[in-house]
A protein has these predicted regions:
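Low-complexity, intrinsically disordered Ser/Thr/Pro- and acidic-rich segments
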Residues: 9-10, 18-20
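Short, Lys/Arg-enriched N-terminal segments with co-localized hydrophobic residues
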Residues: 19-28
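An amphipathic alpha-helix signature
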Residues: 32-36, 57, 61, 100-108, ...
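His-Asp-centered metal-binding catalytic motifs of divalent-metal-dependent phosphohydrolases/nucleases
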Residues: 73-92, 99, 103, 107, ...
């Protein structure tokens, strides 16, 4: 598997991540901290990178607190950090086509290399494989929290910003008008895919943000003709 060599210098101990074209220096930090250091270094994608992962993790924790849901904090954090890692250039992966499965494959190898507990690793992999909103599957709290948080990150001002950031970086988003159309489509679809009531309540607020923005944009561009 071809990949760009990346050096994540986070400590004195050297170990290579098997089969990923990645060389990592590991420290006495906890594995989850090492994983975050890695994602902070390689997760440079403007839409799916480190900042997105950190927002999703924080939002998932907020949802859990509001819903009083019990969950494993380490599993949720690692799943949030690695759920899109198969999209990053450092891994140069094109197969499998499903990015969730691709990310799960990369994550599994990383977790194995860092001796992550097998049972916890499986829970992380399951959450990653099932993270796209609308994909049916597990009732595990970590999976549901991650899935809802990812859906919410497509809504509101941040959701519109992410769609605009795709212009010119994604083949299917060639211009601003397409990005706006995609954002409007997600505004309509995502709320019905959310599981938790706290997620639905936040989605309603974020949808109002989007509707106000779209209305102002249409007024300023003759209904998007002048975009």
């Amino acid at each position: 598997m071809a990949g760009e060599n990346v050096l994540a210098s986070v400590g004195p101990k050297d170990r290579s991540v098997r089969g990923l074209g990645l060389f990592v220096r590991l420290s006495p930090m906890k594995p989850v901290d090492e994983i975050e250091a890695l994602v902070a270094r390689v997760g440079t994608h403007p839409v799916y990178g480190y900042a997105h992962c950190m927002r999703v993790h924080a939002l998932a924790e907020d949802l859990a607190a509001e819903e009083e849901v019990s969950y494993d904090g380490e599993i949720l954090r690692v799943a949030a950090l690695l759920h899109d890692i198969g999209l990053y250039k450092a891994y140069a992966m094109r197969e499998p086509a499903d990015h969730a499965k691709r990310s799960a494959l990369v994550a599994r190898r990383i977790l194995q290399d860092w001796d992550f507990p097998p049972q916890a690793s499986q829970a992380v992999i399951e959450a990653i494989e099932l993270h796209p909103p609308g994909v049916p599957g597990s009732t595990a709290s970590e999976t549901i929290l991650l899935k809802d948080a990812i859906g919410l990150d497509y809504l509101g001002a941040i959701g519109v910003s992410r769609m605009l950031a795709m212009v010119g970086t994604e083949d299917d988003v060639p211009d601003i008008r397409t990005a706006i159309w995609n954002a409007e489509s997600l505004r309509q679809k995502i709320p019905d895919l959310l599981v938790l009531q706290a997620s639905k309540d936040l989605a309603a607020r974020r949808i109002r943000e989007m509707e106000d923005f779209f209305e102002d944009l249409r007024d300023a561009t003759e209904k998007l003709k002048l975009l």
